[in-house]
Amino acid sequence: MKEYRIAVLGATGAVGREMLRVLEEYQIPVSRLLPLASARSAGSTVLFRGQQIPVEEAAEERFRELDFVLGAVGSGLSRQLRPAIERSGAVYIDNSSAFRLEEGVPLIVPEINGQEALSRPPVIANPNCSTIITLMAVAALHRLSPIQSMVA
């Protein structure tokens, strides 16, 4: 089974910690985990699979030799670091609102259109939390009776 080199950007925040928990819970095969955070949090540790992993400062040079970067930072920092992540060849899965409306960046909800991620776009965005919850219900209804249009 292939193992992945994954960075979690914003690893010490609530969303970053949840990303680490999900990687562990779903037993995602990780060969290298790189927790990244602000200079203030660098040097602290995060618990992953029973090990304390040192947190490094998020900086452009940190994105080398990675398969995926999971972003749990604000839009400004996300936009700032995106070019370096893309240059590295890693897929950037961003949780901020930075790229949600950008043409060519797929908005992916795994349970609904997760197959779109298989083409390995350089950046993947997710809709905001309210939209995701609404789409989960709408997708279930759509499977029962195709919805032609929706007005919000």
Predicted segments — roles?
Residues M1-V151:
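N-terminal Rossmann-like NAD(P) cofactor-binding subdomain of oxidoreductases
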